[in-house]
Amino acid sequence: HEAAGERINGRVLVDGSGVGTYLRHLVPLSRQAIGLDIEFPRVQESHAFAELVVCGAGEHLPFPTGSIDVIFSHEVLEHVQDDQATVQEMVRVLRPGGRIVLFCPNRGYPFETHGIYWRGKYHFGNIPLVNYLPRRLRDKLAPHVRVYTRADLARLFAGLPVQVVTKRTIFGAYDNIIERHPRLGKALRAVLQALEKTPLQRMGLSHFWVIEKTA
């Protein structure tokens, strides 16, 4: 809400809306909350929260140029086929002054949270140190998902009519740990969120960027 400002009251797009978690919170705040997801079963599910949810890909947004006030993209960019085209499309559909609120995986995080492929078999879980390997080897182990440095993100937005309003690296909420071990989870979250105010934020789970369209 804070990142979007008064724009939250306009037309809001959740790019990668999944089962509708964000839509549920945005519908009461906005003039129109729109969902987009590439998986049709998820589109059907999220219709429970918003009237307009479309099945489509981030590389080809089915919206007019300059028609959206805010775009939320939460841990989606790393999964699309073409992240450059996806970024360009988000910027295209934004109105001047509109904002993208973007979360995506940080290469500095000590774990690969999407699992890896090893000897042709997928291994689920948080795999340590994978993201610290040379890019070619890292991408061979995790070809199904990208990670980003700040420089990687800057290159994606280079040459586009935007300015970066917020550029941070954050740790997670660790809700799963809190659910199983409340005291430990809350203590861990407090410590890691305190690190967000130090140089160690570079080891955070995700990039949190707010990007504003300038023209």
Segments (PLM) and residue ranges:
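Conserved SAM-binding loop
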Residues: 1-113, 208-213
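S-adenosyl-L-methionine-dependent methyltransferase catalytic module, highlighting the catalytic core
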Residues: 81-89, 99-210
